């Protein structure tokens, strides 16, 4: 059995430069060559996980099957690889220090002076190797978040440097992703920041084996030659990843430039042809779609689109197979409350709406008003998580006539708590990792819209919530025409909808269908929504 291979992806110049998509693309390219691949994201922040972080600071919290609240890049990895990952695929500084300090308190270090080297770096390497050992992967790709030079990332870069020594040159491959900025005033693409970034990486003791240069537009050969010379690399080891409209074309761009071939040749001593036929078919379908549909995205974190990135991607997946291109109308629900945005105008412009997840008081009434308008106006509407809970609140107020109905999350004193805290959440006072999280079985009611989308009674979907539809009010809601189309094993409401005779498509789910959507296997809920929107558009 050949030794396990490790690919380490680092970044330079600035964060959010494209390391995550580069990692996901390489994972796909190696997987398409028949290798088993795992992808890990390292986040150097001291938080234990992303669960308590503001979406404006960090973007979406991606929930894994086992209930991990992880970085959004884990979502990219899952979508490109087409496989489920776990909480162990997202390593943070908080996890590492928590583990090392716990071991020290337990006496595991036998009186040693606990230091960054070797104790912290050993823990980092152990976490990386554990993912490979558990899965038996041929290749483990590790993306180190942040940029070279960040003080928070130094222990992780040191651990990566040690891995080259311990695992061997032929079993490790370092890729550095750095930005070559474009200056519109002079029309120049500058390579100096990339050169300085490589220099900083070398100071730490890491020589990159390939450099992926991010740029606004394709770089001239002279610029790539400069970078290759400075990095002490052949020209073929400098890859240009320029801006493209469709992220799902990126693996094809990197394949054309030979990135996976470089990695495979070094680590496995051979070159094989990938099978990208199904991926290419999806890309062609997505890019061929010309009929546009307008979808209102009603939420409270709309100023940072990464807050809802899995929902955006799930829409793309479903739309490609329907032959339409979604045009997203971002609607800040707080602006509806303030009167800055006219909900009637949103309704007239959009072909359908998604009421997005979120927590807390801000923007709630704006979401409820949007739900009312799309329900009464009979345009397709999909509510997710908090969007489902507020759909129930809206229905209770405007159909049942319970004008003061609310969720106790927003109004603990409401006389009609149609949404209330889950029984299992009572008495919990810590926020981190304590919600109802991860994949849970969902029992779908036959004869409903949801059943027509899944075609079966049992499904597994991911969750992230503390509140439920209050069972005390379920019978009254059903008598008033609301359909409960799915239940949990514990008896919680998992989905509500309206009958097709009452509304062309009104569906809201407690679970998050977006987390399991894949380019080659779109989520049924999003397929149903997009089909309804496309039908309305004509």
Swiss-Prot record:
L-glutamine binds at residues 56, 358, 386-389, 409, 466. It comes from Aeropyrum pernix (strain ATCC 700893 / DSM 11879 / JCM 9820 / NBRC 100138 / K1). Allosterically activated by GTP, when glutamine is the substrate; GTP has no effect on the reaction when ammonia is the substrate. The allosteric effector GTP functions by stabilizing the protein conformation that binds the tetrahedral intermediate(s) formed during glutamine hydrolysis. Inhibited by the product CTP, via allosteric rather than competitive inhibition. The active site is at residues 385, 512, 514. The lineage of its organism: Archaea, Thermoproteota, Thermoprotei, Desulfurococcales, Desulfurococcaceae. UTP binds at residues 15, 190-195, 226. Keywords: ATP-binding, Glutamine amidotransferase, Ligase, Magnesium, Metal-binding, Nucleotide-binding, Pyrimidine biosynthesis. CTP binds at residues 15, 150-152, 190-195, 226. The gene is pyrG. This is CTP synthase.
């Amino acid at each position: 059995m050949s030794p396990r291979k490790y690919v380490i992806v680092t970044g330079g110049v600035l964060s959010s430069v494209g390391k995550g998509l580069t990692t996901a693309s390489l994972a796909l390219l190696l997987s398409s060559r028949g290798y088993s691949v795992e992808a890990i994201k390292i986040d150097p922040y001291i938080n234990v996980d992303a669960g308590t972080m503001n979406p404006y600071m960090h973007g979406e919290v991606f929930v894994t099957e086992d209930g991990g609240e992880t970085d959004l890049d884990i979502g990219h990895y899952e979508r490109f690889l087409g496989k489920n990952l776990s909480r162990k695929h997202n390593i943070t500084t908080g996890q590492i220090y928590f583990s090392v300090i716990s071991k020290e308190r337990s006496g595991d270090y036998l009186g040693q002076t606990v230091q960054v080297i070797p104790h912290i770096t050993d823990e980092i390497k152990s976490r990386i190797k554990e993912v490979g050992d558990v899965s038996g992967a041929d290749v483990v790709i590790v993306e180190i978040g942040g940029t070279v030079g960040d003080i928070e990332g130094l222990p992780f870069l040191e651990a990566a440097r040690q891995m080259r020594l311990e695992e061997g040159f032929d079993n490790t491959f370092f890729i550095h992703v750095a930005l070559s900025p474009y200056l519109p005033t002079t029309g120049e693409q500058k390579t100096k920041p990339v050169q300085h970034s490589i220099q900083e990486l070398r100071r730490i003791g890491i020589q990159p084996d390939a450099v992926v240069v991010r740029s606004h537009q394709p770089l001239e050969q002279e610029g790539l030659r400069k970078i290759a010379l400075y990095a002490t690399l052949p020209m073929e080891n400098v890859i240009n990843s320029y801006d493209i409209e469709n992220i799902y074309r990126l693996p094809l761009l990197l394949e054309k430039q030979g990135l996976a071939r470089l990695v495979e040749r070094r680590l496995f001593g051979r070159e094989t042809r990938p099978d990208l036929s199904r991926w290419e078919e999806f890309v062609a379908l997505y890019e061929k779609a010309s009929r546009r549909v307008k979808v209102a995205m009603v939420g409270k974190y709309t100023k940072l689109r990464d807050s809802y990135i899995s929902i955006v991607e799930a829409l793309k997946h479903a739309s490609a197979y329907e032959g339409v291109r979604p045009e997203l109308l971002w609607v800040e629900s707080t602006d509806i409350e303030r009167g800055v945005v006219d909900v009637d105008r949103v309704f007239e412009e959009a072909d359908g709406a998604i009421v997005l997840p979120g927590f807390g008081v801000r923007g709630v009434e704006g979401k409820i008003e949007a739900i009312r308008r799309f329900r009464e106006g009979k345009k397709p509407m999909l509510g997710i998580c908090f969007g489902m809970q507020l759909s129930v609140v809206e229905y209770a107020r405007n159909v049942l006539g319970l004008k003061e109905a609310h969720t106790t999350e927003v109004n603990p004193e409401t006389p009609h708590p149609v949404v209330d805290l889950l029984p299992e959440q009572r008495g919990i006072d810590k926020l981190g990792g304590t919600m109802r999280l991860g994949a849970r079985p969902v029992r779908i009611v036959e004869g409903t819209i949801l059943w027509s989308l899944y075609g079966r009674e049992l499904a597994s979907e991911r969750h992230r919530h503390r509140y439920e539809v209050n069972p005390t009010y379920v019978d009254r809601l059903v008598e008033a025409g609301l359909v409960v189309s799915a239940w949990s094993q514990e008896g919680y409401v998992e989905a509500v909808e309206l009958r097709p005779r009452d509304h062309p498509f009104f569906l809201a789910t407690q679970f998050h269908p977006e987390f399991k959507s894949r380019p080659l296997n779109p989520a049924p809920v999003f397929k149903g929504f997009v089909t309804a929107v496309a039908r309305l558009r004509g």
